[in-house]
From Swiss-Prot:
GO terms for biological process: lysine biosynthetic process via diaminopimelate. It comes from Caulobacter vibrioides (strain NA1000 / CB15N). Belongs to the diaminopimelate epimerase family. InterPro entries: DAP_epimerase_AS, DAP_epimerase_DapF. The record marks H168, E218 as: Could be important to modulate the pK values of the two catalytic cysteine residues. This is Diaminopimelate epimerase. The keyword Isomerase applies. One of its GO terms (molecular function) is diaminopimelate epimerase activity.
Amino acid sequence: MSRTFLKMNGLGNDFVVIQTLTEAFDPTPEQIRAIAKRPGVDGKGGIGCDQVIAIDPPRAEGASAYVRFWNSDGEVAGACGNGTRCVAWLLMQSAGKDAVAFDTVAGRLSGVAAGDKLVTVDMGPPGLDWTQIPLAEEMNTERVELQVGPIDAPLVHTPVCVSMGNPHVVFFVDAPVTDDFARGTGSLVEHHPLFPEGVNVGFAHIASRDHIRLKVWERGAGLTQACGTGACAAQVAAVRRGLTDRKARVEFDTGSLTIEWRESDGHVIMTGPITMEYAGKLPELVAA
């Protein structure tokens, strides 16, 4: 029997969402890659997405679901900010509620309705210790000894590292970078030996104390139109460096997220839109 999926996106960062309340979903990495592969000019390929998301029955009291994420390369992802908003919206729609909580491998997340297809999610506190990223060696994560390019004229250097349930490194740049720059530099840094689990790479331009321009090279997915945890990491990194206030607009080419690193409890709060694209059926070979 084929399985129904929902295609959703947050600022163009797109997902195949599979609800498993009545039928388990235990895909192989090959099946995830088959689903995520974007169709070519010949029409061959999968559905196409940055991440695959499974919404499972809850495993703990107080949660509406247990949620799993995979990157398009087939590897399990610890967290996904834009995907979290999409999941929160779906669960709220299903329950007829304005607030919801669900569990992930990275911990419990919660979301509240903030308007028409606008969702605010509590992403929890960031991980700032080198062991939480993780890094291969002890290091001050506010000023990491890393650079790309010639020693006397590096392209980017001295980034900040943050965990948002997944590892991020944020480079501050004097001007917004091009897609080609983000691809070339991001792909190099993603697999740097300093990051034993790989890393998401952000390039953040501080436009003002409440405005960041951002591009993100996602671990296992490549250059994406938007990255929710990347936006959270960029804002946390900027606050740590004294570059922005606690609340800022993080802008991608496709739109903006509002990110607040709340001083009262240290949690990162993200507000942004979701888009429901369509529903479909998985091909039999990848229905898992």
